[in-house]
Amino acid sequence: MKILFLIFTFQFCLALPFLFPSEDEEHKIRNAMPEKTTVKPAKLHKALIYSHASGFKHSSIPTGAKALRIMAEKTGVFDATFTIKTEEFTKKGLAKYDLIIFNNCTHIQKAF
């Protein structure tokens, strides 16, 4: 059992650099984002950002999430809630949000 744990830990450590955007990628994202919107929204919108992939796990999911986080931060147009869970996908849960963004989701058609 210990050897399996060590193997898993080692594999996870090897994959860690690929789980998050690099500093260079984040810098490029920040530079590409506008500092402000062209039209000021009447209110701060609440966004649910869903990033679950049931099949192939796209390596761009963390980059997309980072870009959306930076966009929310820089523009102030929306407040983002990030999730990979489906608990919010109820009538009551969705009523809290103005918009839903599906970030590289796969194999979710049957769920919705």
State where each predicted segment sits:
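Bacterial N-terminal signal peptides
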Residues: F5-A15
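Helical hinge/lid and interdomain linker segments adjacent to catalytic or ligand-binding clefts
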Residues: L16-L19, I49-H52, F56-F112
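N-terminal pre-domain segments of enzymes
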Residues: L16-L44
